[in-house]
């Protein structure tokens, strides 16, 4: 699925921020959201246990939690809501990830909501998409459309913030800067590289490690080693 995620991210960036496909840059995801016509709000708690990091509103109305309690009244279409607890219980990288996640929903998944509305479906989940940024524990054979949308947005978001084609240039540059040889003796230098990449791309260290692995670096004995492009 990595190629599919990368293709979706490339299409998104071609439309909203093509510079990220031309050279290594920090993707200004908040500015992109604004340019998409989205408003970001970060004042409201979206769930009791922070199992919802953010959501995007497709249709004006009240927003309810999983227990049907109203958590936001009169939310407006085109609003991205981020739970403020994400800042101090997670990382700034998680906030950026969540915003990218919501932007992708707006870009890619509005047709689903439009279809449900046209069909007259009583589809509460189609009015908003709540994002937990975690693995779906249900059997994928039992997933509904909304579960597939979440899975896709979770996969695409880190590719938007750290697109492969130009991120490889940055990684190569830092491998040289930190004199990394992948000989099992440079674990600390690799960690320094990951920290710099996380800061540069506005992602968490874990997300950066996953992206590095997806780009062809396999983790062996605590370090990353290039293995035949796999």
Predicted regions and their residues:
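Active-site hotspot residues in diverse enzymes, especially metal/ion-binding acidic/histidine motifs
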Residues: 1-230
């Amino acid at each position: 699925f990595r190629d599919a995620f990368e293709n979706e991210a490339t299409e998104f960036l071609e439309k909203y921020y093509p510079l990220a496909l031309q050279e290594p840059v920090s993707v200004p995801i908040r500015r992109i959201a604004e340019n998409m016509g989205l408003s970001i709000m970060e004042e409201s708690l979206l769930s009791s246990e922070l199992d919802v990091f953010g959501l995007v509103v497709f249709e004006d109305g009240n927003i309810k939690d999983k227990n049907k309690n109203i958590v936001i009244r009169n939310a407006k279409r085109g609003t991205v809501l981020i739970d403020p607890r994400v800042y101090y219980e997670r990382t700034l990288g998680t906030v950026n990830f969540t915003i990218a996640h919501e932007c992708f929903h707006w870009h890619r998944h509005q047709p689903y909501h439009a279809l449900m509305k046209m069909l007259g479906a009583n589809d509460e989940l189609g009015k908003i998409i709540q994002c937990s940024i975690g693995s779906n524990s249900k059997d994928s054979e039992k997933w509904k459309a909304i579960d597939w949308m979440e899975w896709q947005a979770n996969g695409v978001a880190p590719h938007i913030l750290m697109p492969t084609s130009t991120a490889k240039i940055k990684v190569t540059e830092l491998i040289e800067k930190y004199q990394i040889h992948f000989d099992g003796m440079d674990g600390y230098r690799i960690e320094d590289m990951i920290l710099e990449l996380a800061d540069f791309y506005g992602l968490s260290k874990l997300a950066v490690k996953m992206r590095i692995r997806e780009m062809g670096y396999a983790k062996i004995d605590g370090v990353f080693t290039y293995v035949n492009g796999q």
